[in-house]
Amino acid sequence: MIRYTKLPATCAVLLLAAGSVMAQVQPISTLPLQAQGENRWLLPAGEYHGQFVIDQPMQLRCAAGACCGPTGQGSALIIEASDVSVEGCTLLNWGRDLTAMDAGVHIAA
């Protein structure tokens, strides 16, 4: 026999808070970038979950199979610097709330 109980309010609040923590923006430097020259970086293949901010000039190239995304809310990449180029990246599961300015790539510079 399976019994269902109501989720206590404190657990619901903790779950909501955990979701907002997971959606926090991280510096692009938290990814395993490989140097390819001055201000040139390669993101190797893999799945990278979260929102990442680029706050300095750089050329970011993603290897085949490199995917990033914020798991359904927010923007995958937030660009806050000039002289930034992004090439070959697959951006998945970014938010759909245009009022919150969600986008695959949000250019704030």
UniProtKB/Swiss-Prot annotation:
Superkingdom of origin: Bacteria
Keywords: Periplasm, Signal
Record protein name field: Probable ABC transporter binding protein NosD
InterPro entries cross-referenced by the UniProt entry: Pectin_lyase_fold/virulence
Localization in the cell: Periplasm
Organism of this sequence: Pseudomonas aeruginosa
Function field: Required for the assembly of the copper chromophores of nitrous oxide reductase. Could be part of the ABC transporter complex NosDFY.
Family: Belongs to the NosD family.
Subunit structure comment from the entry: The complex may be composed of an ATP-binding protein (NosF), a transmembrane protein (NosY) and a solute-binding protein (NosD).
Residues making up the signal peptide according to the UniProt record: 1-23
Cellular component GO terms held in the UniProt record: periplasmic space
